[in-house]
């Protein structure tokens, strides 16, 4: 990789700064909408809080943002980029060779990130719309929570509905809008603190520790469940590394953190000034002059939509990476935008919409949603910490230092997990159930793939070259196709699945001019597109290894078209002149792709557990994208052949011939 690429990745720019604000910080930047509200309501309301409680709460928020977001994610995790890409699956690909069990934290972390993220649009949009209760002229309408729910659902329907068309056209405004949003947070927060400058004493961690053990804190350690809301977007910050570059995050985070902290301090100052006023509005909106609240709600709604959009796009990317790592079922992926990074997965989009909408309908208020929010993301952070420890060791950090550093973060995050565990009974169970369902699907898919690798027998292609040559030249068989292409998941050296040779020679002898054996390998580099060809000393058998990055589409016909042209131009593959064609000078014949589907046989090698895995995987396949769609074969000639999973052992069942009576008497 060239130094210029590394420099560009680590370099900051004005444009990159603005783009980072719109892509990276949506989740963490909208936390001020509901974090202080959650703290105050769980304490019993504005009139129940004391100065020490407020100082302690702000101190806890500041040091949570510092320890988890700044130190762990910005200063440590951002260095763990996989060819400029971040996120838990990118981190996993960096360390997976160090231990086979690391697939477990990767799957758990990915599942919890997806499940908890489904709550983000519900919480942020609902919190923003509830701000209308503080707007003169509209408050009487939105005091009725049903109107809040209806407005929220309309916004969500539009947001999820436009995903299929791509979001590039609105993505251009994300950065400027979020710059205005953060600037407003900082400026309004600063002006609110002018009357209570003592709030800045919260920078001292003494107030944070004092509150945890103070009798004024009605919830004890469980207050950290609300504090954690301030940093739930830290994992998304790491996941979006590839979109904006490390340098732009390094430069933009201090600005974002300053604005967020000022917003929290401003809300805290307003609470101290109005704790006897009896006002029950969200401190975020109540701390702003009433004549500005309408504009603030509009801005907050835009910020909430941007945060939700970042979550949706991140979910598509996360699922896409999991599919290419073979730990998630294949779903149809489309690219509505001009670049590969802008993808759309219809099934995931509408599942997210259903979960988000059900969350709004079931919990109704943002306060109830906050009670369930953040539980699963603590698990994601713990899983990231485990993987980071291995990454630090791989990069040469002394093991004792790596263990100590990650043990510290694991302890902090485990305390947050325990504090958030109370949320399980207040709706967090829904998120946990969703996460467990995703982990179950991932496990079934991964385990099923391993079982296939364990049992399917392989044969050496070289041993069958002569038979294939004779079949090619045998005019007694009609020409099946000019080019026959087999896609194989398992092709090492010249060993190939027995089922493929069985298809060519036994099931129905397939006479062709050229036989192609294509293996697609997903690389750790996100945007690789390379190939390797072996003609096997012939001009009729071609082994192709396609090396595609885990973020590249696996549209095999496109790549194969380029490979054929390269081979013909180099003289390694004879031209295939067509007698009948509407394209003058066409020298490439027709292609047929043969896909082989392995189904569970009744062979005794499979244990009951393995049979359960394979049968469950087969059931899941009914709702997933077919290999034909996944490999971009919709417009190609395709034949699907079904073979039993185990071909290596045909069981002989005992059976006796019935002897006619007259024969036995004779």
UniProtKB/Swiss-Prot annotation:
Assigned keywords, A-Z: Cell membrane, Ion transport, Membrane, Potassium, Potassium transport, Symport, Transmembrane, Transmembrane helix, Transport
Recorded GO CC terms: plasma membrane
Catalytic activity from the UniProt record: K(+)(in) + H(+)(in) = K(+)(out) + H(+)(out)
Gene that this polypeptide is encoded by: kup
PANTHER family referenced in this protein's UniProt entry, alphabetically: K+ POTASSIUM TRANSPORTER, OSMOTIC STRESS POTASSIUM TRANSPORTER
GO molecular function: potassium ion transmembrane transporter activity; symporter activity
TM ranges: 16-36, 58-78, 100-120, 141-161, 165-185, 221-241, 253-273, 299-319, 343-363, 373-393, 399-419, 424-444
Cellular localization per UniProt: Cell membrane
Pfam family, one: K_trans
Highest taxon in the source lineage: Bacteria
Record's protein name: Probable potassium transport system protein Kup
Membrane topology, as annotated: Multi-pass membrane protein
InterPro entries tied to this protein: K+_transporter, K_trans_C, K_trans_N, Kup
Function, as annotated: Transport of potassium into the cell. Likely operates as a K(+):H(+) symporter.
Sequence similarity: Belongs to the HAK/KUP transporter (TC 2.A.72) family.
């Amino acid at each position: 990789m060239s130094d210029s690429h590394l420099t560009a990745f680590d370099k900051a720019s004005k444009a990159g700064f603005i783009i980072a604000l719109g892509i990276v910080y949506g989740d963490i930047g909208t936390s001020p909408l509901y974090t202080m509200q959650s703290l105050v309501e769980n304490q019993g309301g504005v009139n129940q809080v004391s100065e020490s409680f407020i100082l302690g709460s702000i101190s806890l928020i500041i040091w949570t943002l510092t320890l988890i977001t700044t130190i762990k994610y910005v200063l440590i995790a951002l260095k763990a980029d996989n060819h400029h890409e971040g996120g838990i699956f990118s981190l996993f690909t960096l360390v997976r060779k160090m231990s086979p069990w690391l697939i477990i934290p990767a799957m758990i972390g990915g599942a919890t990130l997806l499940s908890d993220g489904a709550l983000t649009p519900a919480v942020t949009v609902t919190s923003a719309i509830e701000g209308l209760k503080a707007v003169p002229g509209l408050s009487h309408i939105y005091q009725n929570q049903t109107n809040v729910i209806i407005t929220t659902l309309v916004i969500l329907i539009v947001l999820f509905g436009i995903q299929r068309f791509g979001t590039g056209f609105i993505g251009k405004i994300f950065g400027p809008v979020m710059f205005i949003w953060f600037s407003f947070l900082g400026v309004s927060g600063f002006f609110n603190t002018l009357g209570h400058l003592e709030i800045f004493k919260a920078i001292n961690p003494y107030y944070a520790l004092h509150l945890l053990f103070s009798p004024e804190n009605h919830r004890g350690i469980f207050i950290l469940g609300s504090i954690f809301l301030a940093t739930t977007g830290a994992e998304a910050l790491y996941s979006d590394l590839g979109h904006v570059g490390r340098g732009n995050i390094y430069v933009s985070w201090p600005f974002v953190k300053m604005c967020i902290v000022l917003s929290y301090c401003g809300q805290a100052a307003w609470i101290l000034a109005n704790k006897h006023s009896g006002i029950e509005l969200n401190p975020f909106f109540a701390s702003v002059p009433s004549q500005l609240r309408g504009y603030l709600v509009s801005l907050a709604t835009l910020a909430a939509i941007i945060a939700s959009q970042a979550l949706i796009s991140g979910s598509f990317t996360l699922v896409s990476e999991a599919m290419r790592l073979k730990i998630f079922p294949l779903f149809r992926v489309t690219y509505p935008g001009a670049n590969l990074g802008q993808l759309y997965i219809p099934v995931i989009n509408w599942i997210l919409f259903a979960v988000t909408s059900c969350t709004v309908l079931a919990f109704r208020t943002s306060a109830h949603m906050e009670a369930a929010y953040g539980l699963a993301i603590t698990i994601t952070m713990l899983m990231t910490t485990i993987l980071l420890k291995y990454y630090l060791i791989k990069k040469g950090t002394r093991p004792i230092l790596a263990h100590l550093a990650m043990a510290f973060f694991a302890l902090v995050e485990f305390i947050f997990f325990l504090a958030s565990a109370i949320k399980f009974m207040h709706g967090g169970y829904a998120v946990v159930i969703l996460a467990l369902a995703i982990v179950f699907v991932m496990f079934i898919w991964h385990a099923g793939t391993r079982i296939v690798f364990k049992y399917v027998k392989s044969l050496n292609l070289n041993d069958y070259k002569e038979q294939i040559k004779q079949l090619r030249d045998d005019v007694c068989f009609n020409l099946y196709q000019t080019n026959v292409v087999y896609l194989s998941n398992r092709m090492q050296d010249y060993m190939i699945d027995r089922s493929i040779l069985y298809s060519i020679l036994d099931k129905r002898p397939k006479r062709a001019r050229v036989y192609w054996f294509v293996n697609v390998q997903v690389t750790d580099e996100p945007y690789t597109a390379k190939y390797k060809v072996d003609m096997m000393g012939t001009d009729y058998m071609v082994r192709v290894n396609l090396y595609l990055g885990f973020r590249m589409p696996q549209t095999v016909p496109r790549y194969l078209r380029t490979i054929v042209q390269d081979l013909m131009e180099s003289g390694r593959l004879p031209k295939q002149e067509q007698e009948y064609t509407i394209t003058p000078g066409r020298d490439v014949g027709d292609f047929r792709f043969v896909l082989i589907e392995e189904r569970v046989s009744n062979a005794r090698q499979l244990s009951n557990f393995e049979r359960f895995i394979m049968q469950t995987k087969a059931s899941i396949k009914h709702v997933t994208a077919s290999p034909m769609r996944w490999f971009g074969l919709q417009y190609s000639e395709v034949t699907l052949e079904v073979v039993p999973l185990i071909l290596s052992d045909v069981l002989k069942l005992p059976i006796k011939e019935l002897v006619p009576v007259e024969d036995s008497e004779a």
